[in-house]
Amino acid sequence: MAKKSLIYREKKRQKLEEKYHLIRRSSKKEISKIPSLSDKWKIHGKLQSPPRNSAPTRLHRRCFSTGRPRATYRDFGLSGHILREMVHACLLPGATRSSW
């Protein structure tokens, strides 16, 4: 189980990313439309003004059961070992154990 403080920090980053998402997207569109380099630098400065934690690259996908940041399957939102336990307990419909 991940520490509660790390999970709360991740939730805070998600809120910041949602808050500044439109600002980042509009600034990127403006940069692509403007041909002059000096104007691009001005808009680039505006693009760097939001907080660092509002960047989408700083977000992790976490297991919603344990909060583990690594080995998380996108389809299920679970980490690998929790996914395996749930499949063995027949808690995930449609998921089967592989056998060959």
UniProtKB/Swiss-Prot annotation:
Primary localization: plastid
Cystine bridges: none
GO biological process: translation
Record-linked InterPro entries: Ribosomal_uS14 (IPR001209), Ribosomal_uS14_bac/plastid (IPR023036), Ribosomal_uS14_CS (IPR018271)
Gene3D superfamilies from the UniProt entry: 1.10.287.1480
Family annotation (PROSITE patterns): RIBOSOMAL_S14
GO molecular function: rRNA binding; structural constituent of ribosome
Localization per Swiss-Prot or TrEMBL: Plastid, Chloroplast
Protein keywords: Chloroplast, Plastid, Ribonucleoprotein, Ribosomal protein, RNA-binding, rRNA-binding
GO cellular component, one term: chloroplast
UniProt keyword Cell wall biogenesis/degradation, yes or no: no
Keyword Acyltransferase found: no
Pfam families: Ribosomal_S14
Homology family: Belongs to the universal ribosomal protein uS14 family.
Assembly, per entry: Part of the 30S ribosomal subunit.
NCBIfam families for this protein: PRK08881.1 (NF006477)
Function: Binds 16S rRNA, required for the assembly of 30S particles.
Protein name, as recorded: Small ribosomal subunit protein uS14c
UniProt organism field: Aethionema cordifolium (Lebanon stonecress)
